[in-house]
Amino acid sequence: MSPVLTQHVSQPITLDEQTQKMKRHLLQDIRRSAYVYRVDCGGCNACEIEIFAAITPVFDAERFGIKVVSSPRHADILLFTGAVTRAMRMPALRAYESAPDHKICVSYGACGVGGGIFHDLYSVWGGSDTIVPIDVWIPGCPPTPAATIHGFAVALGLLQQKIHAVDYRDPTGVTMQPLWPQIPPSQRIAIEREARRLAGYRQGREICDRLLRHLSDDPTGNRVNTWLRDADDPRLNSIVQQLFRVLRGLHD
């Protein structure tokens, strides 16, 4: 009896719910592909590498109808990368003015979002939001291809809203409660800034969130002590002690 060959048998392709939703946006609402134009405002090209990785067959952003074009006059989505330098400010503005309405502006990468490590240089204006109105932010240094495609998905939803002039407003009287209402905003901001300075953006935010959660549940600090004892990490202990010094300085 001859063996059954399986390597050349065609397998059906199944799409997840998010992919199907994006395709419905393109086919029913936008009714055409969404064209993306890159505006390099003065970056190191790491963001460009990730953008091109996102449109390769591995991640295949084109399956959602997302295509990169070479002229802003054809673009629906403008993708601003890099910190805005003085030399690139006017070219970036010309690209923005050349793109037809209704356009979506995306700030891509840490430098595009807020200037990154170059934010305070004499030749840098800051993030791309200093020169154009930004609709979508994609943070990262650089953002991953998965984060890039997710940002494109958000941009597609906004593009649909702009094309059909859809506006959303919160119901009257509805307010958002802070995550930790027991802790004043000034203290939360000071702790988060110091934690990010000591441990970086990602780990600093995680340490800050966990510390605030423990302090919110147990102001006596017993849960914080248990957390530090279980972690058994001298570096974490040093960071948390510094954050407590910041808190005491605010109370003094």
Swiss-Prot record:
Cofactor, how bound (note): Binds 1 [4Fe-4S] cluster.
Cofactor: [4Fe-4S] cluster
Pfam families membership: Oxidored_q6 (PF01058)
EC number(s) from the headed UniProt entry: 1.-.-.-
Annotated positions binding [4Fe-4S] cluster: C41, C47, C111, C141
Alphabetical list of InterPro entries matching this protein: Complex_I_20kDa-like, NADH_UbQ_OxRdtase-like_20kDa, NADH_UQ_OxRdtase_20Kd_su
Keywords: 4Fe-4S, Iron, Iron-sulfur, Metal-binding, Oxidoreductase
SUPFAM superfamilies for the chain: HydA/Nqo6-like
Coiled coil: none
The keyword Cell membrane belongs to this UniProt entry's keyword annotation: no
Domain of life: Bacteria
Example GO molecular function: NADH dehydrogenase (ubiquinone) activity
NCBIfam families, per database record: PRK06411.1 (NF005012)
Its biological purpose: Possible component of hydrogenase 4.
Family to which this protein belongs: Belongs to the complex I 20 kDa subunit family.
Name of the protein described by the UniProt record: Hydrogenase-4 component I
Organism, as annotated: Escherichia coli (strain K12)
Lineage, broadest ranks: Bacteria, Pseudomonadati, Pseudomonadota, Gammaproteobacteria, Enterobacterales
